[in-house]
């Protein structure tokens, strides 16, 4: 009985301790980071080889541009390059076999032009600094009308697989409007980014796991020479 009494007291004490709140004292100091702070020599020495390796990779020449490749609206050579070479990469990788597809990216996602001359890995990173992946969205074919309305409202985005001329539109050879249509885009846009809400009505969305930036790097390496292309994809 005495042992039971002692155990009961220990259990009660543990319960009261668990229910009580503990105070923790935290002290912080505000450290302003500005140009007066000297680099840490040890840290600098540690990161130096990684920095050198990164710089070496970013400076690696992968192709040549015959002229500046710029973004523009309603159509720009930079957007056409991104669209066309994304499609070409997916074709080579077997993703588009037997599919009727179009493509749409976003003007705002093209962060830097490709300047005339040597093209480096760093140039493609500046163009595409985000880790966006390439996605195939399966949409009802009648959503093409919604996409065109979106393009009219935005003033134009990079597209492929169809053309717009005022109130009229046409599909590229080999593309037909059946019950469904595959749309090549990015994971960001497929999730409704830039208010592309028509993707929310997708039957299915397949993320290829291919980083858009890496696909473009490989395509530039394969092409070697880039020439700006404008082919009247959008005319208002």
Enumerate the predicted regions with their spans.
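Bacterial N-terminal signal peptides that target proteins for export
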Residues: 1-7
């Amino acid at each position: 009985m005495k042992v039971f009494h002692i155990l009961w007291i220990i259990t009660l004490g543990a319960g009261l301790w668990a229910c009580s709140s503990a105070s923790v004292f935290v002290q912080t100091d505000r450290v302003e980071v500005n140009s007066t702070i000297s680099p840490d020599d040890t840290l600098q020495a540690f990161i130096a080889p990684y920095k050198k390796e990164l710089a070496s990779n970013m400076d690696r020449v992968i192709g040549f541009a015959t002229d500046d490749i710029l973004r523009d609206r309603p159509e720009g050579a930079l957007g056409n390059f991104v669209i066309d070479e994304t499609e070409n990469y997916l074709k080579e990788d077997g993703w588009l076999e037997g599919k009727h597809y179009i493509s749409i990216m976003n003007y705002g996602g093209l962060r830097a032009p490709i300047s005339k001359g040597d093209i480096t890995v760093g140039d493609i990173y500046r163009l595409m600094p985000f880790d966006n992946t390439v996605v195939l969205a399966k949409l009802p074919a009648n959503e093409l009308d919604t996409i065109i309305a979106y393009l009219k409202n935005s003033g134009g985005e990079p597209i492929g697989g169809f053309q717009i001329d005022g109130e009229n539109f046409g599909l590229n050879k080999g593309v037909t409007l059946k019950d469904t249509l595959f749309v090549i885009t990015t994971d960001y846009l497929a999730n409704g980014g830039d208010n592309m809400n028509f993707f929310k009505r997708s039957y299915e969305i397949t993320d290829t796991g291919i980083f858009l930036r890496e696909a473009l790097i490989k395509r530039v390496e394969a092409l070697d020479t880039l020439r700006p292309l404008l082919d009247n994809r959008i005319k208002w």
